[in-house]
Amino acid sequence: MINNITVSGNVTRDVEKRGTVDKPYITFGLAVTEYKGNGEKSPMFYSCIMFGKRAASVADYIQKGTKICVSGQLASDNYTDKNGLEHTGFSIKVNDLELMSAKREQESRGW
């Protein structure tokens, strides 16, 4: 079975660097605008995790507001919020990441 997703959107929080020097990984949030057939749009939110040396090297270029495109494996996550309500969220184990614009570039262009 093939499980692959490719989406582009805006990073919702600054990257968190984790792991060790030998096994680094990063986590970040991604908001993707979903366009519906009737002209409405709504956001989809994903938690993202990326492993390896490439993750460590791109971490310094990604911050809240950066527009990126990611490809990876989609997973659903069940969690309980602070009010005790059950929710299902989605996460992406990122295999490939492309910077579409840096936050500084967006600000200079007035995006």
Where are these regions (language model features)?
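Disulfide-stabilized netrin-like
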Residues: 41-54
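Acidic, gly/ser/pro-rich intrinsically disordered tails
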Residues: 1-5, 15-23, 36-41, 56, ...
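Beta-rich strand-turn-strand
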Residues: 51-87
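A generic structural motif
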Residues: 31-35, 80
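Short, acidic/hydrophobic/Gly-rich beta-strand patch recurrent on exposed beta strands
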Residues: 27-32, 47-50, 90-93
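OB-fold and OB-like beta-barrel modules that bind single-stranded nucleic acids
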Residues: 5-13, 30, 64-75, 94-97
